[in-house]
Design a protein with these regions (language model features):
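Active-site donor/metal-binding and catalytic loop motifs
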Residues: 64-80
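Acceptor/aglycone-binding surface of glycosyltransferases and processive sugar-polymer synthases
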Residues: 1-34
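Charged, alpha-helix-enriched surfaces in structured cytosolic catalytic cores
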Residues: 1-4, 30, 45-49, 83
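Conserved, well-folded catalytic cores of nucleic-acid-processing
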Residues: 8-12, 16, 57, 65, ...
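Terminal low-complexity segments of carbohydrate-biosynthetic enzymes
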Residues: 76-159
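Catalytic donor-sugar/metal-binding loop of nucleotide-sugar-dependent glycosyltransferases
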Residues: 42, 52-69
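Donor nucleotide-sugar recognition loop
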Residues: 37-51
């Protein structure tokens, strides 16, 4: 996904982010004060959205990378890569101004699998919605930031 979707998008539209080694790594951190102001895509678009939005607001120097060593990621089945790509592309389109809140939030993706004597069509409905920034949600500021899985008495783990 990184080499076929993310890296070409960064090269074409966000060359200042071309130095990012693993833009879709799944292992990243961000300060809450920055993240709570971002619109957050559902699914696989969240990483590239956070990367692009951070760069847009704070500049490329606000992004640091750390080598965490060798990571073994579970490989996805070939037919699941299409929906993942749709979510990444939709997140980028929104940041380029090509997708708005009025656009469809579910995209029908037609895929074809080889079967004896031809192909079989399958339609997957891919969610490309985005959640509003947390700071725009009524009551966010007054909410407690202690997760319910933390014990209030001793701050120990309940899990």
């Amino acid at each position: 996904m990184t080499e076929l979707v993310a890296r070409p998008i960064l090269a074409l539209h966000f060359p200042e982010l071309a130095h990012v080694v693993q833009p879709l790594s799944g292992e990243w951190a961000i300060r809450r004060v920055a993240f709570e102001r971002m619109s957050v895509p559902v699914g696989y678009g969240v990483e590239i959205a956070a990367l692009v939005d951070t760069c847009a607001v704070h500049g490329p120097d606000a992004i640091a990378q750390v080598d965490l060593g060798r990571r073994t990621h579970r490989h996805h089945r070939h037919d699941t890569l299409g929906p993942m790509a749709v979510q990444v592309l939709a997140a980028v389109e929104r940041r380029l101004g090509e997708r708005t809140d009025g656009d469809a939030v579910v995209i029908p993706l037609r895929q074809f699998a080889p079967v004896s004597g031809g192909f079989e069509e399958a339609v997957r409905h891919v969610d490309v919605a985005e959640r509003p920034p947390a700071v725009d949600i009524r009551g966010y500021r007054s909410a407690s930031f202690v997760p319910d899985w933390i014990d209030e008495d001793d701050r120990g783990w309940r899990r």
